[in-house]
A protein has these predicted regions:
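Metal-associated gating/positioning segment near the N- to mid-region
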Residues: 51-117, 135-142
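Divalent metal-coordination and catalytic microenvironments
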Residues: 10, 26, 31, 50, ...
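Metal-coordinating catalytic core of metallo-dependent amide/deamination hydrolases
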Residues: 119-186
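Histidine-rich, glycine-flanked metal-binding segment
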Residues: 2-3, 12, 16-55
């Protein structure tokens, strides 16, 4: 059974009244509020001092890998180093109060697993995977010399570290738009 935490002397905002309640107790088991009102005991007791507890906010546009260092450094850094910085940023994000994040693009599944297994501290992560972006869009981190020129060109750094995109913008012509290639060449 999950441990309990008893928050004593807290005021609860219930969403129905305009002001928080008088001081009361909130019992939490694991990560679930089990009860509000006078409670006998918990495995851990925290005196709220009349404050209003709130669940941790959700950051719906967070990037585990990119938030950890400036873009210029990110583009040239070794992936193992980036992973360590991302773990540090995850802990900082949690300490700022966000208990859940939606990763908005990048290879965050390994970091999510490390957090879920208790290896590193961080918020609950809902990973996105690769960013979908058109060529030269905000999710295209390729340097000009990395753009493949032939089918056998070496993989770009973005592809090597597993952050490749799923889709790309219009490339060449098609039966419906045969002049797309001509427009690109102008």
């Amino acid at each position: 059974m999950a441990e309990t935490t008893l928050f004593r002397n807290v005021r609860v905002f219930d969403g129905e009244n305009e002001v928080p309640s008088e001081e009361t107790d909130v019992l939490v088991r694991g990560s679930t509020i089990e009860g509000v009102g006078p409670a006998a005991d918990g495995d851990t007791t925290v005196d709220g001092g009349g404050r209003v507890p709130m669940p941790g906010p959700i950051d719906a546009h967070w990037r585990s890998m990119i938030n950890s260092l400036p873009a210029e450094a990110f583009l040239g850094a070794e992936i193992g180093y980036i992973n360590h910085l991302a773990a540090r940023e995850a802990e900082r994000t949690l300490m700022r109060g966000s208990t859940t994040v939606r990763d908005a693009g990048g290879p965050s599944s390994g970091l999510k697993r490390a957090i879920d297994e208790g290896i590193v501290a961080g918020p609950r992560i809902y990973p996105c995977g690769a960013m979908i972006s058109q060529s030269s869009g905000h999710g295209d981190f390729r340097m000009p010399h990395e753009v493949p020129r032939t089918p056998m060109s070496p993989l770009s750094r973005v592809m090597q570290v597993g952050a490749a995109r799923i889709a790309d913008g219009a490339e060449g012509g098609s039966a419906r738009h045969p002049r797309a290639t001509d427009a690109r060449r102008r």
